[in-house]
Amino acid sequence: MQLSDRIIPTPQKLNVSEKTFALGSFGAVSYRIAQSKAHFSLEKATNRLKAELKERFGCEEKADASLVITLEGAEAPAGVKNPDQGYAIRAEEGKIVLSAFGEAGAYYAVTTLLQILKAEDGAFTLPAFDLLDYPDLQKRGHFVETRFGTDLMELEDWKQVVDAMVDVKENQLTVSVYGCWNMQYDKRISEYVFLPFKGYEDLKTPVYKKYYSPKKGDYVFDKVGTPMAEKDFFGELRAYGKERGVEVIPMFNSLGHNTLIPRLYPETSAKDENGNPANTGFCTAEPKTYEILFALYDQIIDRYSTPDNPIESFDIGMDEIRNEFAVDPADITHRHNAWCQCPICRNKSRQEIFFEHAAKLMKHLHSRGVKTVYMYNDMVVEHKTKLKPNPEDHSPLLKEALAKHGLLDVACVDWWAYNDVPEKLHFSDLHPELGFRSSIKPWNGYYHWSHVFHPIGNIYHMIKMAHASGAEAKRSYSSWDNSFHRPNQLQADWSWNWNGTGTMDDAKARYVRRHFPASIEAATKAFDLWDDITRQTNVQDPKNTLSNRREMIFSFLVYYRYSYYFDGRDYPRNYPGELVPKLRAEADFCAELREMQAQAEEAAKVFEEVAKANPDSAELAMRYRYEMMLYTAIFRDWTTLMDLDALAAKFSETKDEAIIAQMADLAKAQKNFRLEVIALLENTKEDYLIPSHARNQTIPMQYFADLEAYLKNTPAAELKLDLSDMRHMASETFMNLR
């Protein structure tokens, strides 16, 4: 592997000589570490270097070593961006010098050296080289949502997130600690609180585990608390991040995605036109709203801010403030308005309410020592929808409001969008001419509990916009699953070194060379298949599924989508029968399904071959194989249903009972395949991911188990075989899982 491919992210400047020098074999490297003076601390970097090299080389330092590794402070050369994070490395026979331009740069220099020092056949060899490196963007990291998976992460799991970010030189982890979504499972609103609050003990949310475990040989039905809230380890996580150069900051969604507080404290809720609590949003004319919000903010700052690690950044969210169904358990069919209609609020524009509210929150946080307050952009530059094809741009009003309250240096607008296609993004630049701070928020795929895809087009075009518009940060919208290793690493590359990382094809090829060097052609093929299965294209009709497969999968094929209430449809939804009329009517849709299934099956086989040929990355390749097995199972659900529907029609005509046996065998085969994939899940992924992933997989498995039992145990004359609605055969277990 060439030296540049070992370094993550892609370095800015690297000159490699043809000369090489040997360091020695494992257990026999003669080395010592020296430290020169610097105007900043080198302690963390030096301690890490000593500990890591002792393990890497398998031996202690020697006073008379033939290789001296020196860590020193230095002045950054002209033209270096973010110099406190920059560094240089010079390597030649007998010495390696790490010159850091700041404390963070020293830590990154060590990270790079450790990436370079890899043994081959038990021996360490290096070429002579000179490297100058620094990041294009000042802040680089992830916003990790309060959602499925994160609600079960222990402190050690969160530490692994920090470690993964350190490995790619990222320096900011935002943890969502309060957020709410619509009703989905268990006839409950999806609400999450990740911190305990004194005096507000009712602000806590349980986690329901409901799935079949092949490992246990039984169903799991349990209710537990969220570890971060129950064990109160957010402060420990912040300290762990601080020690490793990663700022860990809280996000508290403070207007949209907000149902728990207004439901429990109805005086704070947005009011409908009759003055009744809407159980969503806030009334910004109600003093109690700010009494509670400021009390919760203050507890976060007082408890988790320390003299050596103050909370200087805080995210208030403020996205997707809208009218929604299924945000009130008492009435899921009514559309509730998060914008207050009380006598005071109804006489203000939404922009006036929004900007006044944001300013109040920012001013309070700034008074508590917070220097940067992040806020989403979509209420500033509205997102394009079918109902609003030409949304309004309120960014000049934002500048006016920030300037009025002296917050231009405090507010940082977080620009987010999900589409891979640049023409379909909600904005084309970040309005640098207005002079407010901005960060970019691509996403990493997020929906790991349902299905994993890699939105590389979105990442590329969003970070391109960040560089063009002078954004200061990349703060990906994320959930954590190492199946997002590829998009996460490409984000790190493009936010560190835009020009050097190159095009999407360049970045994807480099990723394969880094991790699967023995199978470049095969790994490229597997990823190409994956990307084609989940492709997103620039089509006028987002439901043109033959072009836009990602929409096809998300809207029609995965169970997760059927967990939502949709206006005019039964709830719980008629799953999977709701899609059967489309399968009957659209031959092209069915043909596409079968092609996607064949592609997923092929990709799974290729990733298995890649794992065998690349032992250092075998675990990662097998994880990717699992994702392709899951896609195979998803597509097989529907191709099996198509075959069952054809047999049911044949039985209706012939009354041949042998057809029922065929149908039972098909249902059994798909049930067993689903069980195989759930077992693979349990052997592949971390414990905190299993319940949410397995639940979405157990539901289709249970459908086929119920169908098999129904076909085997019901007299043929009594069978009701309309696959568009088989709810009459649903077991209690099937309904409980939902």
Task: Identify the function of each model-found stretch.
Residues 1-140:
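Contiguous, structured surface segment used for ligand recognition
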Residues 10, 82-347, 353, 440:
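Feature activates predominantly on carbohydrate-active enzymes
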Residues 31-42, 70-75, 99-101, 145-146, ...:
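Structural motif
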Residues 33, 37, 281, 349, ...:
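Conserved short-loop catalytic and cofactor-binding motifs
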Residues 45, 49-52, 164, 168-170, ...:
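A short, Lys/Arg-enriched amphipathic alpha-helix followed by its capping loop at the start of a domain
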Residues 61-63, 250, 375:
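A structural preference for short, hydrophobic beta-strand core positions in alpha/beta folds
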